């Protein structure tokens, strides 16, 4: 039976709408983790498909400056993995949450304990950007009997045979990385990006979402046209931190009709 994240995103895809997943940094709020539910419900009320929730880490190798600084602010507020898990247990939401964490915080907490402690929460997906596919067995056995999907990341340099290997048996969605580099860098897309995304669609039987560098209305239109939806991080994080209006951008993303 498919996991909840797979079912919910496939249901959105079936309507012809683009899937929209904003990223937020847990604890990057004037109230620290006490403000997490407020942010989640703000985004839920705007109709987002799912929410990616980042765990702060001191050495975020895949993150650009906006998200790295958000992580430092969160750590300064006292955010810990344990405290986040306890906070997530108290949050009620109808949309799936996807945790983005580097492997170190997960390892320190204990993978088995982490998964068990999230069992009764809204967390339905897990992204670990620094965990090689060859080491997925460090995590996958603990997810097998849960409703949490391990999300595969596929880069632009991934050949088709490797794509098949990464995607085989995956649930939730495929995270297609739009740029070679860190999050937040926009506009420097490779000429063969659309071809790469089309190829991903041929081998994936779950939604393909494009992320890294997606930040403008033009990006929304481009990537919704060649994938099933988008993930937006740095733009959302920056707007929430600086108190900038972001509602119209999110509404446009949520309403996108293919």
From Swiss-Prot:
Cellular component, GO annotation: cytosol
Pfam families documented for this protein: Trp_syntA
Name of this protein: Tryptophan synthase alpha chain
Protein EC: 4.2.1.20
Pathway this chain belongs to: Amino-acid biosynthesis; L-tryptophan biosynthesis; L-tryptophan from chorismate: step 5/5
Keywords: Amino-acid biosynthesis, Aromatic amino acid biosynthesis, Lyase, Tryptophan biosynthesis
PANTHER family: TRYPTOPHAN SYNTHASE ALPHA CHAIN, CHLOROPLASTIC, TRYPTOPHAN SYNTHASE, ALPHA CHAIN
Family membership: Belongs to the TrpA family.
Domain of life per record: Bacteria
Protein task: The alpha subunit is responsible for the aldol cleavage of indoleglycerol phosphate to indole and glyceraldehyde 3-phosphate.
Subunit structure: Tetramer of two alpha and two beta chains.
Enzymatic reactions: (1S,2R)-1-C-(indol-3-yl)glycerol 3-phosphate + L-serine = D-glyceraldehyde 3-phosphate + L-tryptophan + H2O
Any GO MF annotation of the entry: tryptophan synthase activity
Residues at the catalytic site: 52 (proton acceptor), 63 (proton acceptor)
Entry keyword Lyase: yes
InterPro entries, alphabetized: Aldolase_TIM, RibuloseP-bd_barrel, Trp_synthase_alpha_AS, Trp_synthase_suA
